[in-house]
């Protein structure tokens, strides 16, 4: 049984906990502790009730300052300094670092000094970590000595499996990406101050361009794609599910049917459970609570002049990513035991 702690219990932290119980992985992973500065009553309430993902079916209670889910008791801490957390006493194997603020090796090593054996960051990190993993593509690179690992981003997890499939079958020369991302909690409900002037504006009233490092994230997973991709991102007034408009120029000449067939076969084969394929006339809310990293919308595939291919990909940017956090942590332990 893997003993884990969650540091930072926001959208991703809570999704990880709920995904653990819904995915059937509870027999492999035990959440021992949560560190979150919010009040315990709010922690319990937002675990039980969620606007995006609905009510959590197991009853969640606050008992003597701890979270209780069925027979499971999870300790709650409110410690701002990770180095002071009792990970050694709790025998923590992996910390899910989900604050969104601790992104480099030195900061993550506070968890190691506190007694945790490994750290998995739920965010793109600095380059000094032991590895950045997109599960299904490069998790085989994990090694026993790796202590600090990044799970990349939700959009990197969405797009990299597709690029990998296209490159292996047809060769990818270059690409351009537009991420159409649901609003996030770094935006404003009504106009308010922010360092990014576009993010001073009300999230529910505008399509808002934001900076993205997605192209660099692709390079970290697929180094041979260096300088081949560029990306832009806009935030839209929905609370969950993201679409990615991917355009790639291929080495080989293809048609729509060939591209879709290759992607559908990959979804049913090597990337089963990670990549999906649909030819139904669906909209973004149909992918809410989908545990896969990416779903190809085959109805939107286009080919121009035989080599320029445009794809539409969907992902639940919370739920899919939370499920990959679980998968990557299991892969980290497997590598450590090999």
UniProtKB/Swiss-Prot annotation:
GO-annotated biological processes: glucose metabolic process; pyridoxal phosphate biosynthetic process; pyridoxine biosynthetic process
Enzyme Commission code(s) on record: 1.2.1.72
Annotated site, Activates thiol group during catalysis, chain positions: 181
InterPro entries: E4P_DH_bac, GlycerAld/Erythrose_P_DH, GlycerAld_3-P_DH_AS, GlycerAld_3-P_DH_cat, GlycerAld_3-P_DH_NAD(P)-bd, NAD(P)-bd_dom_sf
Superkingdom assignment: Bacteria
Pfam (any one): Gp_dh_N
Gene Ontology cellular-component annotations: cytosol
Catalytic activity: D-erythrose 4-phosphate + NAD(+) + H2O = 4-phospho-D-erythronate + NADH + 2 H(+)
Pathway: Cofactor biosynthesis; pyridoxine 5'-phosphate biosynthesis; pyridoxine 5'-phosphate from D-erythrose 4-phosphate: step 1/5
Active site as annotated: 154
Binding site for substrate: 153-155, 199, 212-213, 235
Record keywords, A-Z: Cytoplasm, NAD, Oxidoreductase, Pyridoxine biosynthesis
Residues the record lists as binding NAD(+): 11-12, 317
GO MF, one annotated term: NAD binding
Subcellular location: Cytoplasm
Chief location: cytoplasm
Assembly behavior: Homotetramer.
HAMAP family: E4P_dehydrog (MF_01640)
Family (UniProt): Belongs to the glyceraldehyde-3-phosphate dehydrogenase family. Epd subfamily.
Record function comment: Catalyzes the NAD-dependent conversion of D-erythrose 4-phosphate to 4-phosphoerythronate.
Official protein name in the record: D-erythrose-4-phosphate dehydrogenase
Protein's organism: Shewanella oneidensis (strain ATCC 700550 / JCM 31522 / CIP 106686 / LMG 19005 / NCIMB 14063 / MR-1)
Gene behind this protein: epd
